[in-house]
Amino acid sequence: VIGADILKRGNIKLMKKMNTSLIIREFNSNGPLSRADLTESTGLSPTTITTLIDEMIKDNLIMRVGEGESSGGRKPILLDLNPKHGYILSGWISGESISIALLDIKYNITDIIEKEIIFPTDENLIPEIKTIIEEIISSNNISNEKVLGLMLGISGIINQQNGTIKYSALLDLENYSIREPLSKYFSFPINIENDTNLAALSEKEFGHKHLSNYIYLMIAPEIGSGIIFDNEIYRGRFGRAGEFGHLLMEKDGPRCTCGKKGCLAPVLSQYIPINKAQKFRNAFKDLEPGSKKYEKFCDYLAVALTNYIHLIDNEAIIFGGELVKVASEKFYSDIEAKIKKYSMKNMYDNVRVLPASLSDNEVIMGGASFCFHNSKYFKNKEG
């Protein structure tokens, strides 16, 4: 009987936590909302909504933000998350710089620091990250306790479980620990993820929310892909899925940063420089549709994407990175036409080619989403 009583109390506590998480998610996606809005959108009873909202207001997690339209009676009180209740640190270590942003729990970027780091090494990378974090926390008067977590997006093969870069050709780092050394200085959770996976996640949270199976392509300042499969990041058994830039296109082609020959990244770089953002934008703008360079660039890209589609059977291809800032509608239609030409009959039906919804800070926004949804607000465990 005692055991059953403990189990019952535990189940009630867990259900309360799950319902609270559901309400927070609803505010985060659709706020501000009234209590009646929440009852309708969550399916929870008015009594449950009132009880939980009262507790969240008491904890300063929810705040009153105004009044809604009346349908014939008292105007409903509109509520929303208190953005200052918690903060998220989210960053991107690219081949050119380290960018770390401070965001509130409404995903507003309140500050961002970017520092150029041309040659990251075992010796200078961790101190550089530590310095930026300390600077952004200090200048915004945020305590460590207010930070829900840090997410860093990094090019390469990442071990999320132990916070280690298994291998990054772009950064020339192997078996390099990020979480362990940073945890000596900061008490909040520290996570790392492949940068293009985070960019793909940003589309799920902030852009093409209705899509559940798609490939996100980052084109410049690197070439990579993130795969969203059934609404989740698909990493593969060993975290190596999505290395789009290292698809073999020419067995005796130009040498890649990974040391091999003929990867897609160096093959495409023969026509447009990929690994420097500004150089890529300038070169792409100067590229004439129909020119030999343009056709070669689009051809190789379309062939690689055709192979992807044949393997994965996705519903969309989303282009991101620097390319989305300079590509015209003609580019997307040209890629689409070439994929249709190269793909097997019926394989390309219903697959769409789309520009990314976010053209800036897509890795940072995806990282913020990951941090928030893995924070204390969403840990559906007892205690």
Please provide the spans of the model-predicted regions.
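ATP-binding/phosphotransfer module of carbohydrate and carboxylate kinases, centering on a glycine-rich
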Residues: V1-E145, D252-R255, K260-G383
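Short, surface-exposed charged micro-motifs
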Residues: L78, S90, I157, P189, ...
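Glycine-rich phosphate-binding loop and adjoining helix at the ATP-binding site
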Residues: I113-N213, K330-K341
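Short glycine-aspartate micro-motif
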Residues: I88-W92, V147-M151, Y214-M218, G224-G226
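Glycine/GP-enriched mid-protein hinge/lid loop-to-helix segment characteristic of carbohydrate kinases
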Residues: I112-E114, T121, E174, Y185-G290
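Short, active-site-adjacent cap segments at secondary-structure transitions
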Residues: S70, G156-Q160, L198-A200, G224-S225, ...
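Short, acidic, Ser/Thr-enriched surface-loop or helix-capping motifs
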Residues: D104, Q160, I228
